[in-house]
């Protein structure tokens, strides 16, 4: 799959194992056309994840690495922070747990804001309270996709488009059957997004 996960995986493999052959099979005419191309562009910092969990640790490290990658490739991004807004007392109570979770995940600068404080930041926001999360960010994910493609190709990898995997066969090697041809490899990494279960079958 040629979404953000498949492309980032290919890039890492090429960096960690110089000289290997890596091919990304993408079913669409261009990479990043599904979930990657339609997401909100938010860089999540780990606020919502269980403290100590792998997901929380990867979110904290991932936002750092993504900001570094974007700076290196001149990709529009900003660590602009966000407000988590409580619209009623029940949400305000839950926000305290979110605050504690964020602190446990190592997020610095979290601030509890009252209605006046949050409206100083965003005058048009509705709600009774907010949690200011300075580490959250935004990014142009289509630009990230194109930078990953360029880097993969510069490292000797290839992106094969219009290559929907219609079948997989295992003998001495794996062979992926696609409309663009059959491709054999020692290893296949399934990064097919929402369709990864179908590919696995």
Spans of features found by a protein language model:
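Dinucleotide-binding Rossmann-like beta1-alpha1 core, especially the glycine-rich loop
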Residues: 41-121, 127
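Glycine-rich FAD pyrophosphate-binding loop
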Residues: 14-38
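Local beta-strand N-terminus motif with an aromatic residue
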Residues: 18, 74, 185-186
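Helical element adjacent to the flavin cofactor pocket in flavoenzyme catalytic cores
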Residues: 131-187, 191-198
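Glycine-rich Rossmann-fold phosphate-binding loop(s) that bind the pyrophosphate
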Residues: 1-7, 27
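Gly/Ala-rich phosphate-binding loop of Rossmann-like dinucleotide-binding domains
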Residues: 10, 14, 151
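Conserved Rossmann-like nucleotide-cofactor binding loop
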Residues: 5, 30, 195
């Amino acid at each position: 799959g040629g979404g953000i996960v498949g492309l980032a995986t290919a890039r890492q493999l090429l960096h960690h194992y110089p000289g290997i052959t890596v091919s990304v099979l993408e079913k669409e005419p261009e990479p990043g056309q599904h979930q990657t191309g339609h997401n909100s562009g938010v860089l999540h910092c780990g606020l919502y994840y269980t403290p100590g969990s792998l997901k929380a640790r990867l979110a904290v490290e991932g936002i750092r690495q993504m900001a570094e990658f974007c700076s290196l490739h001149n990709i529009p991004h900003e660590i602009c922070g966000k407000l988590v807004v409580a619209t009623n007392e029940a949400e305000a109570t839950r926000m305290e747990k979110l605050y504690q979770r964020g602190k446990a995940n190592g997020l610095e600068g979290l601030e509890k804001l009252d209605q006046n404080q949050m409206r100083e930041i965003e005058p048009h926001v509705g709600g009774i309270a907010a949690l200011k999360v300075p580490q959250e960010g935004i990014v142009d994910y289509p630009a990230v996709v194109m930078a990953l493609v360029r880097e993969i190709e510069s490292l000797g990898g290839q992106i094969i488009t219009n290559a929907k995997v219609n079948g997989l066969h295992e003998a001495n090697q794996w062979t992926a059957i696609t409309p663009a041809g059959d491709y054999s490899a020692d290893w296949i990494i399934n990064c097919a997004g929402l369709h990864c279960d179908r590919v696995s079958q």
